[in-house]
Each structure stands twice: as C-alpha cells, then as structure tokens.
C-alpha cells in the first residue's frame, strides 16, 4: 500500500465500478508498476446489521460483492470502457430484445465448483424479473427481454447482477479475486487473494482486503488521517 492516504470518490465508485475504485485507492501513480502484497483496509459507509450476500444495497456491500468476492458478466474499466468479465462476448438479435452471452471457460467458484451457464441463469433470473434467462449450453446463456434494451451489457456490470453458484447463492462464494474469510454483518468483511485467477497480472494486487464499517463521515476521516485505514469513503 502506498504511504499516501486515499479517499474514495463516491461518484467514481458508481461510474467505474467497485473493482476500479478499489484499485484507484492504492494511491499508485499511473506510471508506477503495481506490486503484489500487503493488506488494503477500507473504511466505508452504508453497512447494516441486516446485510447478507443477497440483501444489502449500501456502499459497503456493493464493494464487498463486486470487485472482491463476486464477478459480473461484464465490467466497466477505470477509463470507462465496457468489457467482458465472466462473459467473453455477447451478441444481440431481434432489435436488442434477445441476447446471447458466451461464458469464460475454466472459471471456478471459491469452493472449487466450475462456473456453468446454470449458475448464470439462476443468478440472473432472480433479478431480471421481466426477462427469460435460459441455458443454451454449458458456456452459453440466452436472455430474452420483454422490451428491447441495447444497454443490457452495461446494465449487467452493476453489482446487483453478480454471479453466484446455483447450489449456494447465499453463502458468499463467488469467482472474484478474493475469497471470503470473515463476514460480520454491518461491521466487517475480510477476504484473501485467491491463488490463481483469470485476472492475474491485471488486478488483485493485495494479499488481503478488509472492509470496516464506519457510519460517521468525521470518524472515517479521522481513521484515515491517523493511518488506521488506507482509504475511506469521504464524498465531497
């Protein structure tokens, strides 16, 4: 972690995604090659004692889900480019009412089970309530919308569309860069870097990431200034 304190811009978090915000919080300059290791501690708002891995829309759980524990089919990079995450490509038909997503092969959940189209269908059916999501084959998913939406790939980059294992959707098991080690609702998330990941060499520079819930802005600011955390949610 750089010696410089870092502040998380809430607007950047929502426009570039939690993963990009986590990497931006390192304080490393654009020309400085990233180095692996250490712990990143983030002080965030928005946590509640009712948070679960399937419930909780505050900033705290958004960061915990996306960029740490789980992946989505698509992602928006730090420079605003839409690209595939668990999807390697997608095609639209019927005027953007029907979509096919091709899944990345050889991806595994943190419990060792392989990612398949069935996991994607189970994950998306619960949130795309007005769409039909169907398995085409093990690595292909078809989404049929009630009305055309040319922005569906962008929509699916949001944290509510993370992909969970169909056999354990509420367990905090994902395909993300970090494996869950400790979760205390409304208080803390601790996760450690997985040994191998398809994003190796491009993301996930820390050995561990810890999210700490601090509801009060002034207390988050104090924790940051005293070096108790490495980055904090301090909206202007």
Predicted regions and their residues:
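N-terminal secretory signal peptides and thylakoid transit peptides that target proteins
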Residues: 2-20
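N-terminal signal peptide c-region/cleavage motif recognized by signal peptidases
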Residues: 25-26
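Short, well-ordered beta-strand elements
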Residues: 37-46, 98-101, 141-142, 176-178, ...
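N-terminal lobe/hinge region of extracytoplasmic solute-binding protein
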Residues: 43-94, 173
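Aromatic- and charge-enriched surface segment that lines or borders ligand/interaction sites
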Residues: 89-129, 136, 142, 223
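Surface-exposed binding/hinge segments that line
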Residues: 125-166, 177-184
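Bilobed "Venus flytrap"/periplasmic-binding protein-like clamshell domains
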Residues: 171-200
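Ligand-site clamp/hinge motif
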Residues: 196-236
């Amino acid at each position: 972690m750089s010696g410089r304190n870092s502040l998380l811009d809430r607007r950047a978090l929502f426009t570039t995604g939690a993963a990009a915000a986590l990497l931006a919080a390192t304080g490393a300059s654009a020309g400085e090659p990233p180095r692996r290791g250490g712990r990143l501690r983030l002080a965030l708002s928005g946590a509640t004692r009712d948070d679960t891995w399937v419930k909780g829309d505050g900033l705290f759980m958004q960061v915990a889900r996306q960029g740490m524990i789980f992946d989505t089919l698509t992602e928006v990079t730090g420079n605003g480019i839409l690209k595939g995450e668990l999807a390697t490509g997608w095609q639209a038909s019927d005027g953007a009412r029907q979509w096919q997503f091709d899944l990345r092969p050889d991806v595994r959940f943190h419990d060792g089970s392989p990612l398949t189209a069935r996991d994607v269908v189970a994950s998306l059916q619960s949130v795309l309530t007005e769409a039909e999501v169907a398995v085409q084959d093990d690595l292909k998913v078809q989404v049929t919308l009630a009305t055309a939406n040319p922005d569906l790939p962008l929509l699916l980059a949001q944290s509510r569309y993370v992909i969970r294992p169909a056999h354990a959707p509420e367990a905090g098991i994902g395909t993300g860069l970090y494996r869950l080690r400790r979760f205390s609702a409304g208080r803390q998330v601790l996760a450690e870097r997985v040994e191998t990941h398809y994003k190796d060499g491009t993301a996930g520079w820390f050995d561990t990431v810890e999210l700490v819930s601090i509801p009060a802005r002034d207390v988050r600011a104090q924790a940051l200034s005293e070096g108790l955390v490495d980055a904090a949610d301090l909206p202007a």
